[in-house]
Curated annotation (Swiss-Prot):
Keyword check for Transmembrane helix: yes
Family: Belongs to the TVP18 family.
Highest classification ranks of the organism: Eukaryota, Fungi, Dikarya, Ascomycota, Saccharomycotina
PANTHER family in the cross-refs: CALCIUM CHANNEL FLOWER HOMOLOG
Name recorded for this polypeptide: Golgi apparatus membrane protein TVP18
Length: 172
């Protein structure tokens, strides 16, 4: 049984609303981080066509988006062939304070792009700062670091989830 788009979307938005009901800032930071991945890739590619040194920050933005993918979707660390150094580097960010610092550093790098020219990369800088603030609030409030509960394939007992788990097992 194939997954339909409506099933996937309802599972994603169901997980999204379930996460927001928990009132945990680390979950908010994770969702902002996931959205920032899309922004990094889109705005990094869009700004790469500037005829100035902004190209450097565009490339950095694309690389940041790819690194954030591995930080926010740890499942990819298991299925992608990566070096042990990179994997251990990414695993350092499994708590609120390290993620706060990580996103703050990413934000500062993109804020520095404003020294060259004002571009849409400021949006990426703002969202990195928001993610950092969410992780900082979670750490200050002593909230447990949680990972999002959304499951694209559905609930654990559903047929779609079993098919998704079977595919993952075959990949691994």
């Amino acid at each position: 049984m194939a997954l339909s788009i409506s099933t996937v979307m309802s599972n994603v938005f169901g997980g999204f609303s379930a996460d927001f009901k928990k009132k945990n800032f680390s979950l908010y930071g994770q969702w902002i981080g996931l959205f920032t991945i899309i922004l990094c890739l889109a705005l990094g590619i869009a700004n790469i066509f500037h005829a100035s040194l902004v190209i450097i920050f565009s490339i950095i933005c694309i690389v940041q988006g790819l690194v954030v993918v591995f930080v926010e979707v740890p499942f990819l660390l298991r299925i992608c062939p990566l070096t042990d150094k990179f994997t251990s580097f990414i695993k350092n960010f499994d708590e609120n304070w390290p993620r706060c610092g990580f996103y703050l550093l990413m934000s500062v790098i993109q804020w520095l792009s404003l020294t060259l020219q004002t571009t849409s990369l400021i949006v990426v800088a703002v969202f990195f700062a928001l993610a950092s603030a969410c992780y900082a609030l979670a750490a200050i409030k002593h909230q447990e670091y949680l990972k999002t509960s959304f499951n694209v394939a559905g609930e654990q007992g559903s047929l779609e989830a079993q098919v998704g788990e079977h595919v993952v097992r075959n990949v691994l």
